[in-house]
Regions:
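Nucleic-acid endonuclease domains
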Residues: 1-86, 91-209
Length: 209
């Protein structure tokens, strides 16, 4: 069985969160500010949002939950964000990929639901899903023009308790979009503006099977 190992979260082993930058910070050489900034770096490396869809989805979910700072320090935490004491894992996919030729799209979309070990120093946990809630995010655009991550009308979100994933899919490593949409109650896609309400209802046991 393939096992993915992740470190404990920063909070669990007292890692300080990195300082949030404004984007106006300048690169320097020998104490002299150069003519380019962190914002320029972002434009150079990350402005192709469709190829960085996972990060965009994590950001959108965090903002929907009224969180201004990331919980996931450089990808080394057990989960992507934390809300009301619950660990939330965000997964994203899209029909259109920038590397696909022409107008070819991927109709069969899947999300990773792989179980992992927590390994930190001499501690090694059992193989399990290290979160309480999944939020699966789909960019519905099927070409370059319609696949715009900035337009939140293009997105559909599925909020599913990890307990449901465990009960229905056991040790499966991936979950297809088709199977996701057939999960009773939780397989109904929602819009961005009700993510927080849906998560609150799950935490408060107002949504259950």
């Amino acid at each position: 069985m393939e096992v993915k190992t992740k470190q404990k979260s920063g909070k669990e082993h007292n890692m300080e969160k990195p300082e949030l930058l404004s984007g106006n910070e300048k690169f320097c050489l020998n104490g002299i500010e150069l003519g380019f900034t962190v914002r320029d770096y972002w434009q150079f490396q990350f402005s192709n949002l469709i190829d960085n869809l996972g990060y965009v989805a994590e950001f959108l979910v965090a903002k929907a939950l009224a969180k201004d700072e990331p919980d996931n320090c450089n990808g080394w935490t057990l989960f992507d964000t934390q809300y009301r004491g619950k660990r939330i894992e965000v997964k994203a996919t899209s029909y259109w990929q920038s590397w696909k030729e022409g107008h070819e799209i991927s109709e069969q979309r899947t999300f990773s639901i792989r179980k992992t070990h927590v390994k930190y120093q001499d501690t090694d946990s059992k193989l399990e899903r290290q979160n309480d809630i999944y939020i699966f995010c789909l960019d519905k655009g099927k070409n370059k023009e319609s696949s715009n991550p900035l337009n939140l009308e293009n997105w559909t979100f599925y909020v599913v308790p990890t307990e449901i994933i465990n009960n229905l899919f056991g040790n499966q490593k991936t979950l297809s979009l088709n199977r996701l949409t057939k999960i009773e109650k939780y397989g109904i896609g929602i819009t961005y503006d009700i993510i927080k309400e849906t998560v609150d209802n799950i935490i408060d046991n107002k949504l259950s099977i």
